[in-house]
Amino acid sequence: MIQHGFDMYRVYLSTPGDLLREQDACRAAISEVNANQAMPLKILLVSVGLREDGQIVGFRAAVSENVRQCTYFIQVFEDDWGPNNLYRKLLHLAAECRDDSNLPMREVIVCLKAAPHETDPAILAFRKELEDREDMRMLRFNNVENLKSQLMDVCGEWVRAIEAAGGGVKD
């Protein structure tokens, strides 16, 4: 989608409300890749998504439509699916969008925060379910700096793939 002189690609950030520092790290990674790699090529990764769980619950139809319009989806987790399995539903929607050739979704990434001392069986089962998925890339991280670094690499890959496919605004 070309607007304002840039070829724009939406990146949906999905993070439970207790992971706002991680969400900020995701936004910072996208911003740095934009400034250093994407914008010189007239490409722009645009982060979208709501910051609070309640906002998502209150606007489910709009959030779902937002996911459907995105090219990339980043899901950050630590210990559960959020209230009423809210983030499980978003993750499954993103995977369905990626598998639908009529939609722009290209990749779904799960970022799983380390929980080395976790012993709760329900949380361990949740983490195993995520780790057993083979249909999406899994990034494991132990702090926000590590998350940001890994996402900068991923976003850089996306920019290079967009450029290789002929994306960007040509002068």
Task: Please tell me what each predicted stretch does.
Residues 25, 29, 62, 66, ...:
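Alpha-helical scaffold elements adjacent to nucleotide-binding pockets in ATP/GTP-utilizing enzyme cores
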Residues 47-52, 78, 86-89, 112:
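Structured N-terminal alpha/beta-domain signature
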Residues 3, 112-171:
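C-terminal interaction surface of TIR/SEFIR-family domains
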Residues 1-76, 102-105, 169-171:
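Conserved N-terminal substructure of TIR/SEFIR domains
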Residues 21, 82-86, 120, 149:
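Extracytoplasmic/secreted cell-surface and envelope-processing proteins
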Residues 53, 79-80, 104-119, 145:
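Short beta-alpha junction loops
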Residues 79-100:
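Conserved TIR/SEFIR loop-to-helix hotspot centered on a Trp-containing motif
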Residues 74, 107-111, 139:
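Hydrophobic/aromatic beta-strand patches that form the interior of the parallel beta-sheet core
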